[in-house]
Swiss-Prot record:
Site (Increases nucleophilicity of active site Ser): 88
Record region (Disordered): 1-43
Biased composition (Low complexity): 26-36
SUPFAM superfamilies from the UniProt entry: beta-lactamase/transpeptidase-like
GO biological process: beta-lactam antibiotic catabolic process; response to antibiotic
Protein name per the record: Beta-lactamase
Transferase among keywords: no
NCBIfam families: bla_class_A (NF033103)
Anything else known: The class A beta-lactamase family has a specific amino-acid numbering system, sometimes called Ambler or ABL numbering and often misspelt as Amber. A multiple sequence alignment was used to derive a consensus sequence and then the consensus was numbered taking into account insertions and deletions. This allows use of identical numbers, e.g. for active site residues, despite differences in protein length. UniProt always uses natural numbering of residues, hence there appear to be differences in numbering between this entry and some papers.
Keyword hit for Secreted: yes
């Protein structure tokens, strides 16, 4: 039976992946495409988010949408934050969209010199290599940095990821560098940044929309639901009987992010992206802020 996967044009001709480049001055931010009309903000909800920013001494951005009712909650949802390791879920989606099941099981070889810090899975498989399927699992579920770079390399580097996101309607996210440089999160630098609204859009397209073939959606959803790094963020702020699939990210300047699809019992899914930052380069991340913000958002959505 013929494979019915849609392989986008960006995936058919992958340019050679460039080496990580040294920091350069900020580029101009890409234009933000207009989205659907937003739910009018609730002053009480905005006040609660503002209070959380003060409590945690951090900048908070959040976007959540009930895919059943269309109701949304937004707070600084169109401001830029460094996306950090959340990109790994999007890169995995791009890999899925550009491969057949047989190609997913092809072994990717890499050297010890390519290993990065925070590579708990790939560090144990240098001698044997790993399949693309295994690398996606390692990147999404364990936030393995080496796996993340290998996925980027497969789709044509940051430029290839940008093209894949543009194909699903994201003209906001700017993918520019590789792990670990993409985590620098210097205020005002638009490289490797996105917005809560844009990341929520991407995740919705890949997990709930038709951007991926059905079997690819199922794979990505499974990896997100079995993520091992998200227990203290969005998952901690929603009812225990909700199913959550998420991808976290952390960077300098206290950057801490989580993008998730939430499945409440007997309701349509909720898609949520929470992004945070602080003023000092070595500031600690505040996981509890993301959990508290998620709690406020789901309460507001009812």
């Amino acid at each position: 039976m013929a494979d019915r996967r849609r392989v986008h044009a960006w995936a058919r001709a992958r340019p050679a992946a460039p080496e990580p480049a040294p920091p350069t001055p900020s580029a101009a931010a890409p234009s933000v495409a207009p989205g659907p009309a937003a739910t009018p903000p609730d002053p009480a909800v905005e006040q609660e988010f503002t209070r959380l920013q003060t409590q945690y001494d951090a900048r908070l951005g959040l976007y959540a949408v009930d895919t059943g009712s269309g109701e949304s909650v937004a707070f600084r949802a169109d401001e830029r934050f460094a996306f950090a390791s959340t990109f790994k879920a999007l890169a995995a989606a791009a890999v899925l969209d550009s491969t057949t099941p047989q190609q997913l099981d092809q072994v990717v070889r890499y050297s010890k010199d390519e290993l990065l810090e925070n590579s708990p899975i790939t560090k144990d498989h240098v001698a044997t290599g790993m399949t693309l399927r295994e690398l996606c699992d390692a990147a999404v579920r364990f936030s393995d940095n080496t796996a993340g770079n290998l996925l980027l390399k497969h789709v044509g580097g940051p430029q290839g990821l940008d093209a894949a996101l543009t194909a699903v309607g994201d003209e906001v996210t700017s993918a520019d560098r590789w792990e670990p440089e993409l985590n620098s999160a210097v205020p005002g630098d638009v490289r490797d940044t996105s917005t809560p609204r844009a990341l929520a859009h991407d995740l919705r397209q890949f997990v709930l929309g038709d951007a991926l073939a059905e079997d690819d959606r199922a794979l990505l959803t499974d990896w997100l639901r079995r993520n091992t790094t998200g227990g203290t963020v969005i998952r901690a702020g929603v009812p225990a009987d909700w199913v959550v699939g998420d991808k976290t990210g952390s960077g300098y300047y206290g950057g801490r992010n989580d993008i998730a699809v939430l499945w409440p019992p007997n309701r349509a899914p909720i898609v949520m992206a929470v992004m945070t930052s602080r003023e000092e380069p070595r500031a600690k991340r505040a996981d509890a802020l993301l959990a508290d913000a998620a709690r406020v958002a789901v309460t507001a959505l009812g």
